Swiss-Prot record:
Organism, as annotated: Campylobacter lari (strain RM2100 / D67 / ATCC BAA-1060)
Alphabetical list of NCBIfam families matching this protein: uS13_bact
HAMAP family on file: Ribosomal_uS13
Chain intervals for the UniProt region annotation (Disordered): 93-121
Name of the gene encoding the protein in the UniProt record: rpsM
Name of this protein: Small ribosomal subunit protein uS13
Length: 121
């Protein structure tokens, strides 16, 4: 099992899909990395030589922000929005949808479980 950027890649998958298990690398980025390192998309993760794995590690480390660093950067960006007091920051702070979705119905993912407001008497 190849370990790249602190993530164990699944052995049986093709390397182009295996790299997408790393946070911050999608299929497009995966293919760009493989093109730069000269590795075939069809190769399986368990077929990688140590030199090829090292080349992929080097390419990712030098040119891409992945895993913990990327998560930290995203969290800092959201915190900066909240500190600025921007509209998007306020929506993040209140736990509401940020990108203009309606909230009268739906938005349950952001709002959480329904909370009943007292009945009229």
């Amino acid at each position: 099992m190849a370990r790249i950027a602190g993530v164990d890649l699944p052995k049986k998958k093709r390397i182009e899909y295996g790299l997408t298990y790393i946070y911050g690398i999608g299929l497009h980025t995966s293919r760009k990395i493989l093109d730069k390192t000269g590795i075939s998309y069809d190769k399986r993760v368990h077929e990688l030589s140590e030199d090829e794995a090292a080349a992929i590690r080097k390419e990712i480390q030098e040119n891409y922000m992945v895993e913990g660093d990327l998560r930290k950067q995203v969290a800092m960006d959201i915190k900066a929005l909240m500190d600025l007091g921007s509209f998007r920051g306020l929506r993040h702070r209140k736990g509401l949808p940020v990108r203009g979705q309606k909230t009268k119905t739906n938005a349950r993912t952001r709002k959480g479980k329904r909370k009943t407001v007292g009945a009229k008497s």
